[in-house]
């Protein structure tokens, strides 16, 4: 097995809740209005320190997408998915972007998943 290179991000970061490996900075959040099986999920423009799994077609609330699960490069935990292809024109903005499930990551202040019932969950995209 090769040497593992992990990128340490500066500033306010989201990290793995199991091993604290950095994934993304708050400035790369596109939307906090998504949700998944475990609750809230955030859409990010850039994510680091993940491996990308096999591409697969999934029917989600917003239609058909080709996605690939993403895993923490350090501990192997499933932490979200990457949008490869969005088949609906209105969903094309998601292509090449990443979902991090809040249940599986620590927030920028070390906090875990928090369920705020007052925030609307529009534009969500879990499987139907």
From Swiss-Prot:
Domain of life, source organism: Eukaryota
Annotated Pfam families: Yippee-Mis18
Keyword Amino-acid biosynthesis: no
Keyword NAD attached: no
GO molecular function, one term: metal ion binding
Annotated keywords: Metal-binding, Zinc
Residues that coordinate or bind Zn(2+): 16, 19, 72, 75
Domain Yippee: 12-109
Annotated InterPro entries: Yippee, Yippee/Mis18/Cereblon, Yippee_fam
Family the UniProt entry places it in: Belongs to the yippee family.
PANTHER family tied to this protein: PROTEIN YIPPEE-LIKE CG15309-RELATED
Protein name, as recorded: Protein yippee-like At3g08990
């Amino acid at each position: 097995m090769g040497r593992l290179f992990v990128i340490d991000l500066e500033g306010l970061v989201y990290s793995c809740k199991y091993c604290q490996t950095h994934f993304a900075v708050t400035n790369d959040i596109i939307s906090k209005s998504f949700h998944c099986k475990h609750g809230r999920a955030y859409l990010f423009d850039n994510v680091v320190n993940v491996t990308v799994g096999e591409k697969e077609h999934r029917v989600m609330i917003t239609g058909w997408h080709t996605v690939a699960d993403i895993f923490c490069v350090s501990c192997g935990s499933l932490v979200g998915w990457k949008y490869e292809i969005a088949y609906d024109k209105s969903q094309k903005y998601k292509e090449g972007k990443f979902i991090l499930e809040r249940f599986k990551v620590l927030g920028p202040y070390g906090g875990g998943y928090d369920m705020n019932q007052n925030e609307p969950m529009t534009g969500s995209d879990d499987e139907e």
